[in-house]
Structures are given as C-alpha cells and as structure tokens.
C-alpha cells in the first residue's frame, strides 16, 4: 500500500511540475509580448518576435494563443488582474477598512497609484478597454487559488452596510468614470494632475454609491 501511495505521490508531483512549466512558458510569452508591444508597438511586433524574445519555440505560442490579437487580449486581462490583485492584497493589510464603499475607494486609489508609477500599464490597458472586453477580464482567474476581480467585488459587496440596486451597473459606472477621467491626468497632467483629480473623482464615486443605495442592512 505504501509503495502504491509513493507512486501516486510521484505522479502527482510530476503532473504538478509539468503544469508549473506550462504556466512559466505562458507567463514568459505574456511578459515578452508586453515588453515588445510597449517598446515597438503592437503593429510592428510579430509572433516570431514574441517567441524569440521569450526563448521558446513558435509552436509553443499556439499551445496558448490563437494569434497576436488573442495574446494581446489575454495580456490585458492578465495585467488588469495583476493590478487589481495587488490593490486587494494591500487592502487585506488594512483590516480597519471594513466598510464596502471605503474599500472600493481604497482599491481605486491603489490602482491609480500603480498606474501613475507605470505609464506603460496605462497605455496598454486603457487604450483597449471596452465594457464587453473588460467584463470578460473581470471573471478571469489567473490561478486556481486566485479569485477573479468580480468575485472579489461580490464578496466585498456581500458585507456592505447597504444593499444596492443593479450592482453590476454600479460597478460599470465607477469603472468608466475612473478610466475615463484618469487617463489624461496620469499621462499628461491634463486637465489637472492626478493628485488634484483624486478628491473630485472620489466625491463623484461616493455620489454613485448614494444613487444606487436601496436601504441600510439590519445588523
């Protein structure tokens, strides 16, 4: 019995190692594409450029992506998830912030700071976002043990002090407001620098919350 268990363990470890190798190759391709799209531009980057920069065979690319447009879409979802997960991880280090609306404002502020520190992310993500595409990104889970963005949003919402009508529409309006007003402020300091925009932006987000509130939950 012990021998059989040992064989099972060896096989499980072997499968896990293979899965890790696959994930590493996929990550390498995404990182390569990100670097090339930012530095050379999407139109001037070929699949050959991506695989050569990643150090993998061209056939490996087609194990994960259909074409250049497909890897760009996966890349945007991947980067958007990374940014949100980093903001959410930071929120978890602040257990004193337990109000839903304050949590959303904290995550928004953290994401804007990440974008301000990395203009390449703003250029990649903001230029190609539409609600239809981003809605798919919201349900994208990068790893089996990592929840999707919208799953986290629903979890935070379930502990909110208020109930809200049309939570998805509320999320959409906040997303559009933040992405639409912050792009030029981050990249060009227009019409005002980001730090000057933030108080007005957050006041507008609070207005959206109030607009969608139904009632306060009973404790």
Predicted regions and their residues:
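Hydrophobic/aromatic-rich alpha-helical bundle segments in the mid-to-C-terminal region
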Residues: 123, 158-204, 215-219
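Hydrophobic alpha-helical connector segments
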Residues: 74, 89-117, 174
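Pre-recognition alpha-helix immediately N-terminal to the DNA-recognition helix
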Residues: 28-36, 106, 110
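Helix-turn-helix
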Residues: 28, 36-70, 74
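Alpha-helical DNA-contacting segments of helix-turn-helix folds
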Residues: 72-82, 86, 125, 145
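Short secondary-structure transition hinges
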Residues: 113-151, 187
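N-terminal intrinsically disordered/low-complexity leader segments
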Residues: 1-24, 213-219
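Amphipathic alpha-helical packing segments from all-alpha helical-bundle domains
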Residues: 133-161, 168-172, 199, 206
